Regions:
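Mixed-charge (Asp/Glu-Lys/Arg
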Residues: 1-33, 39-144
Length: 144
């Protein structure tokens, strides 16, 4: 459990730092909320659920886009506005110096009906799939 907690905390701090670099003011809620941070820019507040990806055996990453272990469910607009998946590419891939931030609105996740995402750096997939289906959401900050 400590390992998962550290992965999650690292992800939250990485996303907060990235969003601060992009001009967002960041706040962290106190208590049990379904979102991890609030990002404000130009008077607009966005509730963000951060999902930190974990490296799998074959070099891809997996991140859950849902909540719950036994009773999985999709986040909805009453819970948060977007999910930002953090992928520590710079730590795990030699020659890649930037981490991945995949910005996906909850409406899009509900539309796609995906409980998890498999992520990898563009052009570094295996077999015929060289770019993951989620690449279009990488650094999609304008969607929030």
């Amino acid at each position: 459990m400590i390992g998962n907690l550290k992965v999650g905390t690292d992800g939250e701090l990485a996303v907060a730092a990235k969003m601060a670099q992009l001009g967002y003011n960041i706040s962290f809620p106190m208590g049990g909320t379904p979102y991890d941070l609030i990002a404000e820019k130009d008077g607009v507040c966005v509730r963000v659920q951060v999902k930190a990806a974990t490296l799998q055996k074959r070099g891809s990453y997996r991140v859950n886009l849902s909540y719950g272990r036994l009773n999985k469910g999709f986040y909805d607009k009453s819970m948060c506005d977007a999910i930002v998946a953090y992928v520590p590419y710079s730590r795990d891939y030699e020659g890649i110096h930037e981490d991945g931030f995949y910005v996906i609105t909850v409406e899009k996740i509900q539309e796609l009906k995906k409980f998890h995402a498999t992520l990898f750096p563009a052009g570094m997939g295996r077999g015929r799939i060289r770019t993951c289906m989620w690449e279009q959401y990488r650094d999609a900050w304008a969607t929030i």
